[in-house]
Amino acid sequence: MRTTIRIDDELYREVKAKAARSGRTVAAVLEDAVRRGLNPPKPQAAGRYRVQPSGKGGLRPGVDLSSNAALAEAMNDGVSVDAVR
């Protein structure tokens, strides 16, 4: 189909340069751009990964899992929660 559109001069220069670099027509470059705009590629799902354990694992001795303050202190390497604030 033949049609007339108005586009920015700078954009036209970019399209024309891309067409020249790729050995295609301006119409083909514009058609591809419109198709991609109307039907963008679907994002691919991230591949699964596995966390590799390091060290001997397990709980750090003396950390009370029922206390948020104790957990925060353990995560901050002994610095008290009040000192972090």
UniProtKB/Swiss-Prot annotation:
Residues 37-60 are annotated as: Disordered. The keyword Ion transport does not apply. Pfam families: RHH_1 (PF01402). Keywords: Toxin-antitoxin system. One of its GO terms (biological process) is positive regulation of growth. CDD domains: RHH_CopG_NikR-like (cd21631). It comes from the Bacteria. One of its GO terms (cellular component) is plasma membrane. Antitoxin component of a type II toxin-antitoxin (TA) system. Upon expression in M.smegmatis neutralizes the effect of cognate toxin VapC43. This is Antitoxin VapB43. It comes from Mycobacterium tuberculosis (strain ATCC 25618 / H37Rv). The gene is vapB43.
